[in-house]
């Protein structure tokens, strides 16, 4: 008997020690997160102390440098910005970034999607002379950029796995001998890390003094702490090693302080100037919707939303978890009258390109894609991004949802959340460093019924909070939210897991829900399966339970086990509370209303794009430019040039003015008499030409003076 008592004591001690070890692990993990947060806050304090002025990054000079002052290239930069790129004014930090690059400094740019990162290296490429090398991860992005630059008359080429022999021959000759004009060269990171021939030609270009700038786009791919780490990006440090005096600019939309430090080290740019813009996207409306367990109902809701809010064929993206889901949901949307097609990595490259171009040219309203679609897409007028499934982290969701509204106009970001999606994602990310913690962060974002969605991004990226202005569901929709103590029910859940483990068995979240409902019918009969799963996920996120994973020949399964804080709950030292809300899904009309002239100009840019075949509609006229033309209604090429710049006026000015004049004629009800309309249009065209001639004469006179 005495030995049995001792044995029992030993078992109790083992249980208690295991509990203590679990608590220690949880505390250490919490300590690491606190240290990381402390580091972010210190960096934030330094930035605030600098009154918004960018400062040299750690390792560089601590002196504040004024990149907003006047520089010798200012007038040339303004001329190229407006007359070549058609951009009327700089956005936040663009001018300062360009000035830092022009002085020969290495630069790190953290700028939200739609902030204008591309101009930050494309404009210096035009000003510095020689060749600018741009490393970009995706072929579709490279093709978009090269096409857009070619439409502006800029000599841009790409060297990728799909490049033809003639193109490759031209590029290598231009790099080696400099006989042909090669202003911007786009390559994938694989070309840098794996092609000795390319690096040899690039070295000859450098030795001849013609390599003027190196740009690393989507730079977060360098960091193992980033949400989209790519091994080939690790080898890009060779560029700074081989060409130490060539300025390098690294750009990304998302990077925590940890990621920033990592990529600075990996790219060998310790003395870079760092520009960090706000992560806030005030034009985006964020919302989370409960996802039905019935797939048909989810697609019905998505289709209804698109039909009611975006009936003018405005572009959108629907993200899905798997390739199979992409194909299924694209087909389901088509059956419901939505113009949709799918995009994923298993497709033939030509098919992917075809779908991408149809969507880019507004011939297809919705792309249904996996994460393979979208990084750095060059389409500013995406009006909505819908996540049919959960993203794997806050950073990933910020990046993917941020593909909406890059033109600054109101757009929507909707995430459909269901607890059953969590194990699907966790079994994919558990092997990544902090993969589970990152996933649980976005689960908290989805489960919250009171906290501002936007503030979650501020906290995650270590940025001071800003007003949401009602641009998320939790801030815009009033509802009665209650906190309910579910500790007793949680104890039943944990006890069930404990019993299962004692029998040396495993249980998935779905199995756990069924077992609970069968064993405790009287207590939880009123709870639906979704509500039980919601509680289990809450316990996992709160470290009361945890997920463990087992590989099979065909998949990786997620099982629920006891977490580090389980015994605290069972002993009554921890309470579990959940938010309940009476809020019903309310339809918010957030679509944009375009005037008649704006719609006509939109049709015109699509027509020009289709006729040319090699340019995208927004390259012809941006949505902002259409808005400016519609409000100012120019009647001469001179007035139009002041809105869209010289290059676009020369290319498309006559057709744009004709559309404006036709619209004005209709507005004045001149269409009733065709002769009057023709007379009016003829008179206005003549007046436009005369005013253009006068401007040119005045310009010549000023130059002579």
UniProtKB/Swiss-Prot annotation:
GO terms for molecular function: 3'-5' DNA helicase activity; ATP binding; ATP hydrolysis activity; DNA binding; four-way junction helicase activity; metal ion binding. It is found in: Nucleus. Residues 1-30 form a coiled coil. InterPro entries: DEAD/DEAH_box_helicase_dom, DNA_helicase_ATP-dep_RecQ, Helicase_ATP-bd, Helicase_C-like, HRDC-like_sf, HRDC_dom, HRDC_dom_sf, P-loop_NTPase. Baeckstroem et al identified RECQL2 in a Mediator complex pull-down assay and suggested that RECQL2 could be a plant specific component of the Mediator complex. However, no experimental evidence has been brought so far to confirm this hypothesis. Pfam families: DEAD, Helicase_C, HRDC, RecQ_Zn_bind, RQC. It comes from Arabidopsis thaliana (Mouse-ear cress). A motif (DEAH box) lies at residues 217-220. Its main location: nucleus. GO terms for biological process: DNA recombination; DNA repair; DNA replication. It catalyses: Couples ATP hydrolysis with the unwinding of duplex DNA by translocating in the 3'-5' direction; ATP + H2O = ADP + phosphate + H(+). It comes from the Eukaryota. Its EC number is 5.6.2.4. 3'-5' DNA helicase that may play a role in the repair of DNA. Its DNA unwinding activity in vitro is dependent on magnesium, and ATP or dATP. Can use GTP/dGTP, CTP/dCTP or UTP/dUTP as nucleotide cofactors. Catalyzes Holliday junction branch migration and replication fork regression. Disrupts D-loop structures. Unwinds G-quadruplex DNA, found in telomeric DNA. This is ATP-dependent DNA helicase Q-like 2. One of its GO terms (cellular component) is mediator complex. Changing residue 117 to M: Loss of ATPase or helicase activity. Residues 298-450 form the Helicase C-terminal domain. Expressed in shoots and flowers. Expressed in young leaves, inflorescences, roots, shoot apical meristem, young siliques, and mature green siliques. Belongs to the helicase family. RecQ subfamily. Residues 98-273 form the Helicase ATP-binding domain. Residues 668-705 are annotated as: Disordered. Interacts with WEX. It is an enzyme of class 5 (isomerase).
């Amino acid at each position: 008997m005495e030995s049995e008592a001792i044995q029992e004591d030993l078992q109790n001690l083992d249980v208690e020690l295991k509990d203590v070890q679990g608590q220690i692990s949880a505390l250490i993990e919490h300590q690491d997160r606190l240290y990381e947060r402390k580091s972010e806050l210190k960096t934030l304090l330094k930035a605030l102390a600098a009154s918004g002025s960018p400062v040299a990054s750690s390792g560089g000079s601590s002196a504040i440098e004024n990149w907003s002052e006047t520089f010798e290239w200012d007038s040339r930069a303004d001329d190229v910005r407006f007359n070549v790129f058609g951009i009327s004014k700089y956005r936040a930090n663009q001018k300062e970034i360009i000035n830092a690059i022009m002085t020969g400094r290495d630069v790190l740019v953290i700028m939200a999607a739609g902030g204008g990162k591309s101009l930050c290296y494309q404009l210096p490429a035009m000003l510095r002379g020689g060749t600018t090398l741009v490393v970009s991860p995706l072929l579709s992005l490279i093709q978009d950029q090269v096409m857009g630059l070619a439409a502006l008359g800029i000599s841009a080429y790409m060297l990728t796995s799909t490049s033809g022999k003639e193109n490759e021959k031209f590029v290598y000759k231009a790099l080696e001998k400099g006989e042909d004009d090669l202003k911007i060269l786009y390559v994938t990171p694989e070309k840098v890390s794996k092609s000795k021939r390319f690096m040899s030609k690039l070295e000859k270009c450098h030795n001849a003094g013609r390599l003027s700038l190196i740009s690393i786009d989507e730079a977060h791919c360098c960091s193992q702490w980033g949400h989209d780490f790519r091994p080939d990006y690790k080898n890009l440090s060779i560029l700074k090693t081989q060409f130490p005096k060539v300025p390098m600019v690294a750009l990304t939309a998302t990077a925590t302080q940890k990621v920033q430090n990592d990529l600075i080290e990996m790219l060998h740019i310790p003395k870079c100037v760092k520009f960090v813009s706000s992560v806030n996207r005030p034009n985006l409306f964020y919302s989370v919707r409960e996802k039905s367990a019935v797939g048909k109902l989810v697609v019905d809701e998505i289709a209804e939303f698109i039909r009611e809010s975006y009936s003018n064929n405005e572009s959108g993206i629907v993200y899905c978890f798997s390739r199979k889901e992409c194909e299924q949901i694209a087909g389901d949307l088509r059956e419901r009258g939505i113009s949709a097609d799918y995009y994923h990595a298993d497709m033939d490259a030509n098919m992917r390109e075809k779908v991408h171009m149809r969507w880019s040219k507004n011939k297809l309203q919705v792309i249904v894609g996996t994460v393979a679609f979208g990084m750095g897409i060059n389409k500013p007028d995406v009006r909505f991004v819908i996540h049919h499934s959960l993203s794997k982290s806050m950073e990933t969701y910020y990046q993917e949802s941020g593909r909406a509204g890059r033109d600054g106009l109101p757009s929507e970001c909707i995430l459909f959340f269901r607890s059953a999606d969590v194990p699907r994602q966790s079994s994919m990310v558990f092997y990544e460093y902090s993969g589970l913690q990152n996933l649980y962060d976005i689960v908290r974002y989805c489960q919250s019924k009171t906290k501002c969605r936007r503030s979650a991004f501020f906290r995650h990226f270590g940025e001071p909070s800003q007003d949401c202005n009602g641009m998320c569901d939790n801030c815009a929709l009033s509802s009665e939210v209650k906190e309910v103590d579910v500790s007793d029910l949680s104890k039943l859940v944990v006890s069930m897991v404990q019993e299962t483990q004692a029998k040396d068995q495993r249980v998935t979240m779905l199995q756990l829900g069924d077992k609970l409902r069968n064993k405790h019918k009287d207590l939880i009969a009123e709870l639906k399966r979704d509500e039980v799963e919601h509680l289990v996920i809450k316990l996992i996120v709160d470290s009361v339970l945890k997920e463990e994973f087992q590989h099979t020949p065909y998949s990786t399964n997620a099982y629920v086990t006891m977490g580090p804080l389980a015994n605290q709950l069972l002993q009554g030292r921890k309470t579990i509370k959940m938010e309940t809300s009476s809020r019903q899904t309310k339809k918010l009309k957030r679509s944009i209303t375009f005037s008649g002239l704006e719609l006509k100009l939109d049709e015109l840019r699509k027509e020009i794009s289709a006729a040319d075949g090699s340019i995208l509609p927004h390259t012809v006229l941006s949505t902002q430019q259409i808005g400016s033309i519609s409000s100012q209604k120019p009647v001469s090429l001179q007035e139009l040039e002041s809105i869209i710049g010289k290059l676009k006026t020369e290319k498309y000015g006559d057709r744009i003015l004709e559309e404006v004049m036709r619209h004005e004629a209709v507005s004045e009800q001149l269409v009733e008499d065709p002769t009057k309309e023709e007379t009016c249009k003829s008179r206005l065209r003549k007046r436009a030409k005369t005013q253009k001639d006068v401007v040119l004469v005045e310009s010549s006179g000023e130059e002579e003076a």
